[in-house]
Amino acid sequence: MKSTSPTSDFNGQSVTNGKRTVKIKFIDYWSTLPEELDGYLVMQVLRKHYNVEICDDADYVFYSVMGESHWSVPDRCVKIFCTGENVAPDFNACDYAVGFEWMDYEDRYIRFPNYLFYGNSILPDMEHKHELPENWDLKTEKTGFCSFVVSNHRNKGRNAAFHALCQYKKVDSGGRYLNNIGEVVQDKLAFERKHKFSLRFENGAHSGYTTEKLVQAFAARTVPIYWGDPNVGKVFNKKAFV
């Protein structure tokens, strides 16, 4: 029977069940991360390979874009920047980074765009979008013209596109902003599945910055009307969206 008692490797670091123990900390993330940590992909990957101890006296500090605390992290700590937002890594501030940029920086950077963080929640639906259920009928399944689900007014170009498209035919807006269906939709994917098109604008146009917006549209079997990443065709079939 294998012992579960901690030992030490040649560097003096604790080893339990054949895994090295790493002390980490998350800062400058969204406020609900502590409650969502078990489902956070970075944490899931770490736990596959290490015994993870979350503490203030950390050796590795993961930080994001929701604050400035990372500037006061001691130099002895390894700082790892992770982002799903339209913010490029600053390698003067971090040792390693996980982001969306198309770049090669030896072992200090890995490209992992935003939509990959959604893993099993939407990617399987996107990958099997052409596998239609038996007796599926376009006329009965796609009763709406175009869907639009947003919660704020901050993207002026997106808002203008919505109003312009509404001049042609009604766009069903099911979010908190510009809602015209009488209620806020609870199941975004189910709502969008009823539509032929979906209006999809990123928060900014930057090479590599492709978020879940495009992937969700494919998962709902809609044709995205897309604006954002100018190099989106490196990954996605440009003939599949407008």
What function would you assign to each model-found segment?
Residues S3-V242:
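Nucleotide-sugar donor-binding catalytic core of glycosyltransferases
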